[in-house]
Amino acid sequence: MKKHFLLAGFAALMLAACNNKPASELTLSGLDPAKFQTEVNNAQTALYTLKNKAGMEVCITNFGGRIVSIMVPDKNGKMQDVVLGFDSIADYINVPSDFGASIGRYANRINQGRFVLDGDTIQLPQNNFGHCLHGGPKGWQYKVYEANLIDPTTLE
């Protein structure tokens, strides 16, 4: 029995080792930048990593300017990710959510997707239970932005 357990454990370790990327290719939070490279509406997406002198790290994708990960030290100094995010661009594209979105036409809901401006009633698309949420189904959080990593602390 011990022999089978040891063989199974060894096999599991070998399989795990075969699938791991070198640590230098991953972000501090364990994200693989290659999993954020795709094309959306003829524009290239990517993952950008910012770091400060204190060791904090922020990962942002140019797909909607979404914050994917923020690594900060906990009370014991251990780095922890404080963002609820996905580990690939595919999930941000295919799972209906606004996770990490830092940009949009507006925040929250417009009741029944309708408002009055200068006496005219404006009807917006209803994308959330009869209401218009965060700019509608094609809000700015779904656009791909041009980005340029100037240095480890500056993204433009």
How would you label these PLM feature ranges?
Residues N19-E156:
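Surface-exposed acidic/polar loop and edge beta-strand patches at domain peripheries
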